[in-house]
C-alpha cells in the first residue's frame, strides 16, 4: 500500500519528542492537532484509546505531570526529505492543577500561548471537558486564550461512561450553547469514553477531516 494510502489510525504511532520550550519544536511540516484539558481530564487515556495503544501517552494519577508539548506521529516514516508522517498529535500540558506553583503556571501559559500563536501547521486544538463537571473557570480562560490567538478549537466531552446515557445529548447541547458566541470555537461538540470506546470513531473522523486525510480507518 502506498504511504499516502496508509490508514491514519490503522497502524502504530510513536512518541518523537517532548518540547519544554519553543526552541525544541520540530520544523513546521505536516499538519498538527493538539489536545488540551484540565489535569486528570483523561487526555492521555483518550490519546491512547484514539490510536489503540495503551502505553503511548503516559497516564498518571499525579495531576500536572505533563509539562511539555509531547509529539506523536504515525510510525514508518524516516522524517528525512519527503518521507514525513501525514500529521502529528500534540499532547499539551494539563492545566488547572491547584497545587502547581505560580512559576510553573506562568511557564505553561507562555509556552502554550507562544506555540498556539506562532504555529502555522496547527490546524485545530481539541479541548477536553470532563462530562461530570462541565466547563470550569480555567477552561473558560483557555478558550479565551484560544480565541485571542485565533486558533480553531473543538470541545470534546470525556468520561461519558461516568454519567447516565440519557444525560449525554442534553450535556452536548448545553455545552454547544455555552460556546456559541466564541469566535474560534467549532460549533459541534463531541462526546467520548476512553473506557468504553464510545465516540472514538467520530473523533478520528473529525481529526482526519481537519488535516485533510481521507483514509483514517
Swiss-Prot record:
Q: Name one Pfam family in it.
A: MMR_HSR1
InterPro entries with a match to the protein in the record:
G_ENGB_dom, GTP-bd, GTP-bd_ribosome_bio_YsxC, P-loop_NTPase
- Annotated Mg(2+) binding lies at 44, 66
Q: Which UniProt keywords apply?
A: Cell cycle, Cell division, GTP-binding, Magnesium, Metal-binding, Nucleotide-binding, Septation
Q: Which cofactor does it need?
A: Mg(2+)
User: Where GTP is bound, by residue?
Assistant: 37-44, 64-68, 91-94, 158-161, 192-194
* GO biological-process terms attached to the record: division septum assembly
Q: Which GO terms describe its cellular component?
A: cytosol
Is the keyword DNA damage assigned to this protein? no
Q: Which residues form the EngB-type G domain?
A: 29-213
GO terms assigned for molecular function:
GTP binding; metal ion binding
* Keyword Zinc-finger on entry: no
Name the CDD domains for this protein: YihA_EngB
Protein's job: Necessary for normal cell division and for the maintenance of normal septation.
- Family membership noted in the UniProt record: Belongs to the TRAFAC class TrmE-Era-EngA-EngB-Septin-like GTPase superfamily. EngB GTPase family.
**What PANTHER family has UniProt attached to this entry?**
ENGB-TYPE G DOMAIN-CONTAINING PROTEIN, MSS1/TRME-RELATED GTP-BINDING PROTEIN
The name of this protein is: Probable GTP-binding protein EngB
Q: Which organism is it from?
A: Rhizobium etli (strain CIAT 652)
